[in-house]
Amino acid sequence: MHCLPVFVILLLLIASAPGVDVQPKTKNFMTRASLRDFAKKTPKRLSKLRGCCPRSFLCCR
């Protein structure tokens, strides 16, 4: 009976431990910050392409 409180405390500590990322990082691993930067830069690039040739996208190469 004396071991039960210790056992419960250990279970609570194990459950509150931070999780570990199981998947290994690969070569094309992108962080959230780089994805946010990419999302911000893409509309800027598209707006520059639109401004270079309003009639046709063929001349924007």
Curated annotation (Swiss-Prot):
Localisation: Secreted
Keywords: Disulfide bond, Neurotoxin, Secreted, Signal, Toxin
Primary subcellular site in the record, as a coarse category: secreted
Keyword Phosphoprotein: no
Post-translational modification: Contains 2 disulfide bonds that can be either 'C1-C3, C2-C4' or 'C1-C4, C2-C3', since these disulfide connectivities have been observed for conotoxins with cysteine framework V (for examples, see AC P0DQQ7 and AC P81755).
Domain of life where this protein originates: Eukaryota
Molecular function per GO: toxin activity
GO CC term (a single one): extracellular region
Expression sites (tissue/organ): Expressed by the venom duct.
Entry domain remark: The cysteine framework is V (CC-CC).
Family designation: Belongs to the conotoxin T superfamily.
The protein's name: Conotoxin Vn5.3
Source organism per UniProt: Conus ventricosus (Mediterranean cone)
